[in-house]
Design a protein with these regions (language model features):
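Structural signature of FAD isoalloxazine-binding scaffolds in flavoprotein oxidoreductases
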Residues: 1-7, 54-85, 100-106
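Gly/Ser/Thr-rich helix-start
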Residues: 22, 45-52, 59-62, 143, ...
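A gly/ser-rich beta-alpha-beta helix-loop segment of oxidoreductase catalytic cores
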Residues: 31-69, 75, 140
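Anion-binding (especially nucleotide phosphate/pyrophosphate-binding) glycine-rich loop
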Residues: 1-49
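Short N-terminal helix-initiation segments at or just after the protein's N-terminus
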Residues: 15-19, 43-53, 88, 118-126
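Phosphate/pyrophosphate- and phosphate-bearing ligand-binding catalytic cores of soluble enzymes
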Residues: 74-193, 197-218
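Residues embedded in well-ordered beta-strands within globular domains across many folds
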Residues: 9, 40, 72, 214-215
Length: 218
């Protein structure tokens, strides 16, 4: 869930703070406005800062762990705390928050000065690549599966003949098989049934286990 009125502010000349509910796209635009480089890779990634930290979001050679310095969190009993980047144990689509019951409330990013033109050019380049290859015209949670070692999830799904395959209103994108999209008022059950079917079909066809990149809450 994103909050477009959440706080984003400069901490110093090259560091910014943002509330966890702020959208990544808004943070990227704030960085551009202040001629700060480092978050261009995140421009166009759906979701919030908190979700990006939780999963160590990344694309095009960049990851949240490359720019985050610390985050603020709150435990189930209301206790507040901070973790530095090392303490967050950020890895491929994972963090320490995957294993505890904390809620991320804010994050600090250390960026670098660059010209607005250069930052904007990189942002637009990454967004153009996304538009060309990803189904941004439909709602989705982004890339559905983690990249299995030695393979690409989208290629395996396509090899199993599942491009365009639907369950209810959920569909394997015809543009990029690594995305499950909401094509027509999909329910959570539609999405989960489709994800499970994809996992079974790819396992049967290729012997590869696909692990969801999206976080599932029952």
């Amino acid at each position: 869930m994103t909050r477009e009125n959440g706080e984003i502010r400069l901490v110093n000349e090259t560091e910014i703070y943002c509330d966890a509910g702020v959208s990544l796209t808004k943070v990227c635009r704030f960085a551009l406005e202040h001629s700060l480089s480092g978050l261009e890779f995140a421009f166009g990634i759906p979701g919030s800062v908190g979700g990006a930290v939780f999963m160590n979001a990344g694309a095009y050679g960049g990851e949240i762990k490359d720019v985050i310095t610390k985050c603020e969190y709150m435990t189930a009993d209301g206790t507040r705390g901070e973790l530095n980047s090392q303490e967050m144990l950020l890895g491929y689509r994972t963090s320490v928050f995957n294993k505890n019951n904390c809620v991320i409330t804010g994050a600090y990013f250390k960026l670098s000065k660059d010209s607005q033109d250069a930052v904007k050019e990189r942002m637009n380049d990454f967004l153009s690549r996304r538009k060309a290859k990803q189904p941004l015209e439909f709602p989705s949670a982004g890339s559905t599966f983690k990249r299995p070692e030695g393979y690409f999830a989208g290629a395996l799904i396509e090899q199993s003949g599942l491009k365009g395959f639907s369950v209810g209103g959920a569909q394997v994108s015809e543009k990029h098989a690594g995305f499950v999209i909401n094509k027509n008022n999909a329910t959570a059950k539609d999405v989960m049934d489709l994800v499970k079917y994809i996992q079974k079909k790819v396992k049967d066809d290729s012997g590869v286990d696909l692990e969801p990149e999206i976080r599932i809450f029952n």
